[in-house]
Amino acid sequence: MHTLTLKRVLGFTIVILLLLALFIWGIGLETLKARQVDLLYLGQRHLMLVFTSMFFALLVGIPSGILLSRPAAKGFAEYVMQIFNVGNTLPPLAVLALAMVIIGIGDTPAIVALFLASLLPIVRNTYAGLCSVPASLIEAANGIGMTKWQRLRQVELPNAWPVMLSGIRIATAINVGTAPLAFLIGASSYGELIFPGIYLNDFPTLILGATATALFALILDTLLAWFGRRLSPHTV
């Protein structure tokens, strides 16, 4: 277990170092110093968009997955999941454009669009994880007199957690990768570096925004994996 953890840490460190090397080579120290204030400010705005939309996605997605996995919902759960699947086929840019038409420009439509983009993996994996809990465990929980709430909290959720965490990690990666597009509807993010870099053929600025986004995604995914191992060290 310790060897596996060490390999993961080493692999992550190598990836970070390679990205930093590409980062410095691509933009130069002068560009990094000139854009330092922008990088910090846009990083805070990017974090705000991701964390706010993920908070609401978790707040809605996990309870929805739990409700759909209950025996009373078996008859229509698959139909509801199909609706989520159809919604997920929409490109992120189309979702952002739709949110802009309905709500306007700024942070609010961006958060709504990122929330919708992140929702499906959380609902799907929560539902799949709970449905995959062995029937023998549920029967054993019923046999010792657990209530439905106790069974869910002490038996089903702990066993479904690895699958649920996988969905949360996927949703976070989608969210972080989509957040730069929020620049197109008036929300501040690393897109303010990426898209002007494309329009103006400014390669250093483009690399600065893209690398910052990639590092952000890697760091968040690593933190989520560590958090998952802390909660369930024998299964994650």
UniProtKB/Swiss-Prot annotation:
CDD domains referenced in this protein's UniProt entry, alphabetically: TM_PBP2
Membrane spanning stretches: 9-29, 47-67, 95-115, 126-146, 180-200, 207-227
Any matching Pfam family: BPD_transp_1
Keyword Nucleotidyltransferase listed: no
Gene ablation phenotype (knockout): Deletion of the osmU operon eliminates the residual osmoprotection by glycine betaine in a mutant that is lacking the ProP and the ProU systems. OsmU deletion has no effect on the utilization of glycine betaine as an osmoprotectant when ProP or ProU are functional.
Role according to the record: Part of the OsmU ABC transporter complex, which is involved in the uptake of osmoprotectants such as choline-O-sulfate and glycine betaine. Probably responsible for the translocation of the substrate across the membrane.
The protein's name: Osmoprotectant import permease protein OsmY
Gene behind the chain: osmY
